[in-house]
Amino acid sequence: MSYQITVADTDITFPCEAAQTVLDAAETAGWSIPYSCRKGVCTTCAGGLRTGELTVRGNDTVRGPQHDVLLCQAVPCTDVEITPKRIASRRPPVRKTITATVYRIRRPTRRITLLDLRFPIGLRAPFRAGQYLTVLLPDGDSRLYSMANSPQHNDGAQLHVRTEPGGRFSDTTLATLATGDTLTVELPYGEFSLDPDSDEPVIFLATGTGFAPIKSIIEDQIARRSDRTIHLYWGARDEADLYWGDLAAHWARQQPWFRFTPVLSRPTRTWNGATGWVQHAVLHDHPDLRGRQVYACGSQQMTTEALTHFTSTAELTEDRFHSDAFVPSGDPVAPPSATARPSSMEQT
């Protein structure tokens, strides 16, 4: 049995098979709805249910009208009418499962590892700047990491991994990983990408390894000879946590359209740059965010607070806020009322 999915206030309809989620059905039909973790944690895919009934995994049946239904977890019980944040016709890159070889391991800080992977000779995996891959572990578990390389270099992948004590991958597998070892990865996933049809100024916010997908996007913009205005705010505890701050500073010197503002929450006395929380630094410089697109990647606290502050005090509409919130593996499925935002998930 299949049900009909209708997108409210549009002429878009598509079928959804029994036990298929709304997100999966949309992708099968050639439509793209924002998502990230696909596990019901990040809420990137949250949308409204205007009419009909859905079963949300881990929750009871939901009847319209409802807000913030996790479409990656929602299975129709009837024909339904939905109101996703965004929906677009898009032909995504073909997803591939690849045995990748560890090419290089660098540790710019005690807790950050830059992991360069290479794919078999002649094999490329096209992706959009800002997307992520899944590392498939031998027991069937998985971890998600943003790709920091640009799409022009799609014969491998660069991952920025923050070590978390007790982390299944970051603190266990990574500790013994050596050059020449292999990892099985699947890619690409995610919707944390610039809209190619827009030329509006962009503000990026990053905390920690949230810099990874932004690096991919900016290097893609450089390769495409774009002149779209971009301002990156990268928040960290101290200068050491800005593990590739010299690269961002180099972009700022070389590209007239790019600005870089590092923000430290625990600065030393010699620091003369921005201090505090990265979202507050943005508001200090841009009290009015109308006419801009905002992309936030990093801790869930930062992305959630940025959305709240920007929409309530800086005139930013929610459809212009895009986020990728890193959340630990194993978090429980968020209830439909959760307000936390997106996630290309740095996992442990």
Task: Identify the residue ranges that each predicted region occupies.
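Short, structured interface segments
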Residues: 69-92, 181-183
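Reductase modules of NAD(P)H-dependent flavoproteins
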Residues: 1-80, 229, 233-348
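Ferredoxin-reductase
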Residues: 94-182, 236-238, 263-266
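Short, surface-exposed secondary-structure boundary micro-motifs
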Residues: 50-53, 85-87, 138, 188
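Helix-loop module immediately N-terminal to the HCX5R catalytic loop
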Residues: 181-192, 281
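Short, Lys/Arg- and Gly-enriched loop/turn segments at beta-strand edges
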Residues: 89-93, 141-148, 169, 190-197, ...
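Short, conserved phosphate/pyrophosphate- and ester-handling motifs at nucleotide-, phospho-/glycolipid
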Residues: 130, 210, 299
